[in-house]
Amino acid sequence: MTDRHVLITGGAGYIGSILTSELLRANYRVTVLDSLLFGGESIVPFLNHPNFHFAKADVTEPRAVRDSIKRDWQKPDTVIHLAAIVGFPACQAVGKSVAWKYNVEATKNVHGQSAELGADRFVFASTYSNYGLSEDGKPVTEESPLNPQSLYAETKIASEEFLLSQKDSTCAPLLFRFATLYGISPRTRFDMIVNQFVLEAFTKRSLIIYQRGYSRSFVHIRDVVRGVMMGIEAEKEIVRGQIFNLGTDNGNYTKSDIVNFILKRMPETVVEYKDLTFGGDMRDISVSFEKIKRVLGFDTTLNIDDGVREVLFALKTGLIKDPTDDKYRNAQFIVQ
């Protein structure tokens, strides 16, 4: 499939580094555009791959996409836009103007350049946080009202609104609202709830859990990559202008459920439950993933127990030497 060329913004990141690997494995040409804010070690193994090209750039730059293309390669037919200030804490840390610049204005910039280059598919990484809370207790669908509870969700909704206004353009948007991710990556994050809980249980032998009964939807990072690849390989007219929740109906868990998976492998962990009276991340939501299963035939292959097991293995074996380093946490590292 060397006639297919995919450009990934944020390709050195948590999702992008695995996606790059899988696209190369599937014989795509891959251009990674990344500012390397969190380093570039995750893509070092690809540097000598004949179908890989890297360009260091900031997605807010007006020529970032155009100048990243290798001259003797065909222009990208698909652009996957992952680069962003990701997460509620990180957006709060940088403030509204910076979050808006990198999450909204950059999306418009990257889409515009992608269209000028002739790309016919634009994949956008969004979030199920856009729904806010499940007030009636029913799983939210892609048609449910949006009720953002954070600056991060506000920026993603604004980007979605722009992209959906471009659904009839030659560069057709495809939007994925990811569930909460977990699992190990070449650029692992320990500010994701499952990974974070495993790390705390491993290093402290204890956990403090707030709002134990609050529900969220979870998905393994490798399943997210599979879902994105199914989206770029689907018939264009099937996915043009479409929004898909990306996860599984079997992935809706409370925080107590996550703790139970951890206790299965670390039964010595002491758990203390507390309630938040204000502040913090108060999401309580259940999500439906019926649409992506029906339209794309997607379902997950990994579960929470798989994620707990692999994170624990990485910690026990020392594969990740200093998991407390702030580089594994978006907000803390950005503040530095």
Features from the language model and the residues they span:
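N-terminal Rossmann-like NAD(P)+-binding domain of SDR-like oxidoreductases, especially those catalyzing
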Residues: 1-170
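Structural signature of the Rossmann-like NAD(P)-dependent dehydrogenase/reductase core
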Residues: 8-9, 81, 121-124, 174-180, ...
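Structured beta->alpha junctions
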Residues: 12, 58, 144, 182, ...
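Conserved beta-strand segments of alpha/beta enzyme cores
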Residues: 29, 51-53, 172-174, 208, ...
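Conserved sequence/active-site signature of Rossmann-fold short-chain dehydrogenase/reductase
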Residues: 60, 130, 181-183, 224, ...
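NAD(P)-dependent short-chain dehydrogenase/reductase
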Residues: 136, 149, 161-216, 221-232, ...
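C-terminal substrate-binding subdomain of Rossmann-fold SDR/epimerase-dehydratase oxidoreductases
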Residues: 205, 209-336
